[in-house]
């Protein structure tokens, strides 16, 4: 049988092949045009990012709390220290950089990470400008400040919003005297003895790290050391050193309760601040060369993501049933505490957790001038279940960090809403969030999609 052939013959096949070759060459030409354009866009962003880093370091010369971590070129820090630019000059340079960033907006065809990088850098710079304005004397109300610095505003609550929870606590902790005193008395049975602090924390850290490594790959050599300190307004702090290492300090001014072991080990370590900073350094600074991630300005939107993921990460690493079982089996015995009380202890703690926004209200009223320091401590006692020493410590924290307090509870709620909207793989969504330049305001938008 003679095979069938195209009646149009060989000239048609040649013409068709020629058209395909021309189309392929056109595609290659377009790609070659795009590569230099993308490289140019990246170079522009890198230049703008360097200016941003230098400005953050300059602000740090006027605000000791501002630069939380820096692991970029050492000479940039040295130059900032030598120059000590006046705040007026920093403000001028910040405005100029904002204009330059505005002119460098990537096209809508840019990939998601490029878009996120641009939006992140622009919003972080807005926070630099706001902080400089505050340092030069501008007074902002609580919500104005949190929006300017952290890209978020916490909901407002009244005394009535906490009344139902307080009534439930009254039932769970019956007796005479103020409710906060009864709560404080109840908690005394769960204080970790000072000579047991280190073994309890080590056990908690080992468990948090083990659980994190099952889901998140960390670079070789990552580690942190723990120090016990006094005289601080905070309970724990992660000082990221760069090169995948952290220094974690635990404040022992006040008694430390057994639940705080997992809280601090997760929040400050795995999968919290330590892992967050390690992944930013690895994935964004080293792998992509995004120099803006060599510096962490504390008073910026980055902090809401950092604190929110660190708090939500506790629940990701230790869902309630697993946490209760682990603490009964490991931490209570390590602390030489009675494990049979663990379930009741957490029933009470769960109620007190619902009062967390009372702390925001104390800070809001205090910063807005509606109450003084004593009034803020009184509010924390009555509506937040803070003992007097802890309430006074918290007021010192508010004096130092002001509206930063929203980053813990509002941050956790925003992160929880975002991650739970991403499907059932909480660890996967969590890892992606702490490896990308997301903004607080984008969490609610992305969660709705």
Residue ranges and their predicted role:
Residues 4-25:
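Bacterial N-terminal signal peptides that target proteins for export
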Residues 24-33:
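Bacterial N-terminal signal peptides
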Residues 35-39:
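Sec/Tat signal peptide C-region and signal peptidase I cleavage site
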Residues 40-449:
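N-terminal maturation segment of proteins
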